[in-house]
Amino acid sequence: MSKEKFERTKPHVNVGTIGHVDHGKTTLTAAITTVLAKTYGGSARAFDQIDNAPEEKARGITINTSHVEYDTPARHYAHVDCPGHADYVKNMITGAAQMDGAILVVAATDGPMPQTREHILLGRQVGVPYIIVFMNKCDMVDDEELLELVEMEVRELLSAYDFPGDDLPVVRGSALKALEGEAEWEAKIIELAGYLDSYIPEPERAIDKPFLLPIEDVFSISGRGTVVTGRVERGIVKVGEEVEIVGIKDTVKSTCTGVEMFRKLLDEGRAGENVGVLLRGIKREDIERGQVLAKPGSIKPHTTFESEVYILSKDEGGRHTPFFKGYRPQFYFRTTDVTGTIELPEGVEMVMPGDNINMIVTLIHPIAMDDGLRFAIREGGRTVGAGVVAKVIA
């Protein structure tokens, strides 16, 4: 069928609904699929289909997440919605569902609530780049001034967390009325979809980013030199290009003298491919798993960073007891564990299994990192937490 082929050429954008419990995130998700299917074609998803979210595992953590898809004339969207607050926290920290932008749902009847604030903060910490506000349940508020007040409050809250609160789009609607087919409220869903298209820029594809390959294995091939293997995380490496080996030890430059995949020689290795890269003038013992191969100057090694972390509950196979300052677990980045120490926020004495917490980590070896890098926290090979680098410090 020709339609299927056409769909694949559209830009693909990942979004999700965030916000306080019972403010209508799942109802809005259902309304978007329903109204867009009716307007532009595609399939609608009912509330109970979305609310009954399947379990997934990401970095050893079980998360309930619903994925729906919908189309505007310009784009194809993959949209994630979580049933419970804990699922949002886990989802955002593990990066199980990366969001190019989020729809913050705030009930006009309540205004911003504690989880509204927490989701905005998490969005800031884990690097959700754009937020669009959907003020829900506006059919239940007759007072125009009250709506103005709620909108102002939400904008101020977003500004407080470094989002452009004064400039970002706010749509006033009613997900339930739109779902029930009332035309004036359906129009608000179309307005929201228009903002998804115009306000969230098309994400940069992995292949267009600077080259990076996390090293999984190192071999010595007599007469040819040293080969490192791994899956190209982003970008392209071409034969003859200069690369840097970053992390754990001092950064070293080399040249890629060959790329191979399944024993065949290639001119280049691209994002998503498992390749072997032959390096000039590098000894087998100069390089190890856990380092990365990268475009020169594109990534630096760091030891200290601020992080947002979720600690597994006992039921999830995590610790049975809290930990305190001075805790020294392993931090698993990409392909290797590095021991690190932690610094808890002022006034926090201990962290319980099932908590999420902001903490400063200092590693004993530097690791190639940027803000937004995900990691696992492990004790003797067992995952006890997941985290994200919120801000590199040193």
Curated annotation (Swiss-Prot):
Residue ranges of every copy of the tr-type G domain listed in the record: 10-204
Catalytic activity of the protein: GTP + H2O = GDP + phosphate + H(+)
Gene3D superfamilies found in the cross-reference section: P-loop containing nucleotide triphosphate hydrolases, Translation factors
EC number: 3.6.5.3
Region G5, residue ranges: 174-176
Region (G2): 60-64
GO BP field: translational elongation
Region feature G3, mapped onto this chain: 81-84
Residues covered by region (G4): 136-139
Gene Ontology cellular-component terms listed: cytoplasm
Positions that bind GTP: 19-26, 81-85, 136-139
Region: G1, residue numbers: 19-26
Keyword Nucleotide-binding (UniProt): yes
Family as reported in the entry's similarity comment: Belongs to the TRAFAC class translation factor GTPase superfamily. Classic translation factor GTPase family. EF-Tu/EF-1A subfamily.
Oligomeric form and interacting partners: Monomer.
Role, per record: GTP hydrolase that promotes the GTP-dependent binding of aminoacyl-tRNA to the A-site of ribosomes during protein biosynthesis.
Protein name: Elongation factor Tu-A
